[in-house]
Every structure is written in C-alpha cells, then in structure tokens.
Amino acid sequence: IYQPSIDEALKLAPKAKVYGNYQEVLEDKNVDAILVATPLSAHYKIVMDAFDAGKHIFCEKSIGYTMEECYHMYQKHRSTGRIFFTGQQRLFDPRYIKAMEMIHAGTFGEINGIHTFWNRNGDWRRSVPSPNLERLINWRLYKEFSKGLMTELACHQLQIGSWALRKLPEKVMGHGAITYWKDGREVYDNVSCIYVFDDGVKMTFDSIISNKFYGLEAVSYTHLTL
C-alpha cells in the first residue's frame, strides 16, 4: 500500500486497522466483506482470492480488464455463493431507479433511441512526486493497467441502454483516437460508439476529454425525451 495514502487515511480514522497488503485483509477472520477499488488490471486476482477466502465483495467498475476475467469472476460468484456487487453508480441512484420504473411501466411509450455522453475538459492526469511513479499514479492513461474511456466512463452509460431496454445489443461499431492530449498517453482521449439492438433501436456513446458541453443520457420517445 502506498504509504502517503495510509497516512492520509489515518488522519481521517486514527483508530482504523491498517493492512500492508490485501492478503492480510483476506486472512482476517473478522472481515466479512471487502471493497476493491484498485486500478482495473488488479481487480481479477484480488476478487478471485477474496472469493476463495469466503469474503463478500463490492468491486468498483469496470469489473475486469478482459471479458474472460469478467466471465470467470461471475462463475466464481455463482459457485461460492458469495455476494458480489459492482460499483455502477446509476444502479444505486434513486433518480435512475425511479426513471427505470417509469420506463418499464410503459409510461412514455416505446423507446426509439438512446444517446449517451460523458465529456470532460481536462487531461485526466494527476500530479506525481517522482517520474518513476508516473505509470502507477496515472494508471488510467496506460494500456497495461487501463482500457481508457470505455472502462472508466462508458460503462456507466452503456448500462443505461440494457437497463432501459432489458436486453443486450447485437451489434457494435466504434472508433477512438488521440487527437488533443498528445502527451505520451496510450489510451484514446475521444471515442464514439453505436450499439444496435435486435429491433433496430440504436444507442450511441460519445466521450471526449477536451470539451465538456454535452452530457449525460437522453432516452428518446416519439413525443418526448427523458
């Protein structure tokens, strides 16, 4: 564990028990559940080890670095019977829960399109005290640790389409590039995707981190937009 983070945590909770690594947490019989909020590439091993240790888990989004990791984690959850939550913000937001209740009740009619955005105006960087900590602290910018905008931001919006329509898309097309923040990062600073469902309804996702004009989600009906 990064010592400055431990020091800051102890300022907030001086009596809290401190662990040097996650294995120590899993070995503690007094711990029933853990929260995984590490860089994305570290999720899989921690989650799988936690299941083996009999812990319940709240894992931050996105669940895994690859689809295979996500599949194996889900199967492990099923086989162990341990509770597994993922940190998709909208699943816990009363506004979205209410909106979905109304959508599923047919209050507004049939959905004919969904448009989602997550735009920001900033380089997504954090200051580093030493150059050798660059990839560790700014892990979101490097493919070794991150999938970029799709796993850090898009996952929230993409959930909306499947939640509202209660099904998964059948086709997807997309494009990404580094067009503004040419600072050595490896992940795209803008992406655009189109998801097509079996009835022809389309959901778009756009994200750019050099302009913050649009956001967040729009569900389109014939006579209104939610």
Describe the function of each predicted region.
Residues Y195-D199:
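Active-site beta-strand termini and strand-to-loop segments that position acidic
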Residues T80-F85, R90-R185:
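Predominantly a Rossmann-like dinucleotide-binding segment in NAD(P)-dependent oxidoreductases
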Residues W181, S207-Y214:
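Glycine-rich phosphate/pyrophosphate-binding beta-alpha loops
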Residues T222-L226:
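Conserved small/polar residues in nucleotide/adenosyl-binding loops
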Residues I1-C59, Y65-I83:
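N-terminal glycine-/serine-/threonine-rich beta1-alpha1-beta2 phosphate-ribose binding loop
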Residues R185-V191:
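Short glycine/threonine-rich loop-to-helix capping motif typified by GTGT followed
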Residues S192-I194, V219:
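Residue-level detector of beta-strand face positions
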Residues G200-T204:
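Short, mixed charged/polar active-site loops
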